[in-house]
Design a protein with these regions (language model features):
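Single conserved hydrophobic/aromatic residue that forms the stacking wall/gate
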Residues: 1-7, 11-12
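Acidic (Asp/Glu)-rich catalytic clusters
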Residues: 21-28, 53-58, 117-122, 190-193, ...
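N-terminal active-site wall of soluble small-molecule enzyme domains
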Residues: 27-29, 33-95, 185
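Hydrophobic faces of well-ordered beta-strands that scaffold small-molecule active sites
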Residues: 31-33, 63-65, 102-104, 127-131, ...
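Active-site beta-loop-alpha junctions enriched in small/polar residues
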Residues: 36-38, 68-72, 105-107, 132-136, ...
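Conserved anion-binding
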Residues: 71-175
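A C-terminal functional module that forms or caps the active site or interfaces directly
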Residues: 176, 180-227, 231-238
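C-terminal helical cap(s) of enzyme catalytic domains, especially alpha/beta-barrels
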Residues: 213-219, 234-273
Length: 273
């Protein structure tokens, strides 16, 4: 019975995801599914994650797998292959989750990052390395001073170094995660990593606003991908959209309105800087 219930839950979640993608794909460049929200349901949840990745690719969206992997050696290589690469069994080649980017934890150093960089070079895909995360306690480690400099800045320098090994046309395949809730640090890190895309979580539900984000972008207005999760997928719960007639039944319409508001907020802030 429990397996049937989980299967039904994943079927509902799959339809929910598709409805939001259908309502927003023409407005956005990328999506960032968080794998833990699927893994908690076991095999059925992982299958729903894969369906979401595949459907987003059908809509020509870049898929950033929010997986935060971090290990060393063959294990790190297996993570990199599973999310971004291909595995060969006998004469056949298979892809795993097949995201375009994956988030990676740098705590284990180069031993944990190099296997991902190798796969990025081979597959022309990318990673976002956790540098300064949006959560309140991130400073417990990330703000610690080493020879007078914060750890997040030193990690940013390593991101730039690793990224120099695998450049695309204008940006590296190695990007960074820097939270919208720390705009001053974002300004510093943008200068440290001028050729890296910055993935910016923390917009919306965590308090980030367009005016906080301008320094995450380069002078040409490019180089950052701003992420809003709950603010979009649960927009129908917000009073501002309820006042516009949004209900749980038309949740996808509320998500579209939230995306439009987000675009206007960020574009307006960039125009005024």
């Amino acid at each position: 019975i429990s397996a049937c219930l989980v299967g039904s839950e994943m079927c509902i979640r799959d339809r929910y995801n598709k409805a939001i993608v259908d309502a927003t794909y023409d407005l956005i460049p990328a999506v960032k599914p968080q794998i833990a929200m699927y893994e908690q349901f076991g095999v059925a949840g992982v299958a729903a994650f894969q369906k979401t990745v595949d459907y987003c690719h059908e809509k020509d969206l870049v898929v950033i797998g929010d997986v935060k992997r971090g290990d060393i050696g063959s294990t790190s290589a297996a993570y990199a292959t599973g999310h971004l690469g291909k595995v060969q069994i006998a004469s056949k080649t298979y892809t795993g989750f097949n995201e375009d980017f994956a988030t990676v934890n740098p705590y284990l150093g180069t031993d944990g990052i190099k296997p991902f960089v190798d796969v990025c070079k081979e597959e022309k895909k990318g990673i976002f390395i956790l540098v300064k995360t949006s959560n309140p306690s991130s400073g417990e480690f990330q703000d610690r001073l080493i020879d007078g400099r914060p750890l997040y800045e030193l990690v940013g320098e390593k991101v730039a170094e690793w990224g120099s090994e695998c450049m695309g046309d204008s940006y590296s395949y190695v990007g960074a995660v820097v939270g919208a809730t720390y705009p001053e640090q974002g300004e510093i890190l943008r200068k440290v990593m001028p050729k890296s895309f910055i993935l910016v979580p923390g917009y919306g539900a965590q308090g980030g606003q367009g005016k906080d984000l301008v320094h995450f972008f380069n002078e040409d207005g490019l180089g950052a991908i701003v992420n809003s999760s709950r603010g979009i997928i649960c927009a129908y719960k917000q009073d501002k959209y309820k006042e516009q007639g949004m209900t749980p039944e038309n949740f996808a319409d509320a998500s579209r309105l939230a995306v439009k508001d987000m675009i206007a907020d960020i574009s307006g802030a960039l125009a005024q800087r």
